[in-house]
Amino acid sequence: MTEEHVVYIGKKPVMNYVLAVITQFHEGAKEVSIKARGRAISRAVDVAEIVRNRFLKDDVDVKEIKIGTEELPTADGRTTNTSTIEIVLARKA
């Protein structure tokens, strides 16, 4: 999967990201990866579920879910652990 088929989840409303994922599929992508970390993880799950259950119900399924931890530096020089998630949605055959 190329980097162009990745949607990074941030603080915008959920429907903005849903539209981004749907646009990727309509432009011909076979797979779209939804990535988030920290507090945005729940928003990433919401995006995947809305795309899968409401908009592309019979066309898309969850292919893979990866979870992990990243060490991020803080302002005072220490590191903090932040959870990450990657949800890969794939078009059904």
Curated annotation (Swiss-Prot):
Binds double-stranded DNA tightly but without sequence specificity. Involved in DNA compaction. The keyword Acetylation applies. HAMAP family: AlbA (MF_01122). It is found in: Cytoplasm; Chromosome. Pfam families: Alba. One of its GO terms (cellular component) is cytoplasm. Its main location: cytoplasm. This is DNA/RNA-binding protein Alba. It comes from Pyrococcus abyssi (strain GE5 / Orsay). InterPro entries: Alba-like_dom_sf, DNA/RNA-bd_Alba, DNA/RNA-bd_Alba-like. GO terms for biological process: chromosome condensation. GO terms for molecular function: double-stranded DNA binding; RNA binding. The modification N6-acetyllysine is found at K11. Belongs to the histone-like Alba family. It comes from the Archaea. Keywords: Acetylation, Chromosome, Cytoplasm, DNA condensation, DNA-binding. Acetylated. Acetylation at Lys-11 decreases DNA-binding affinity.
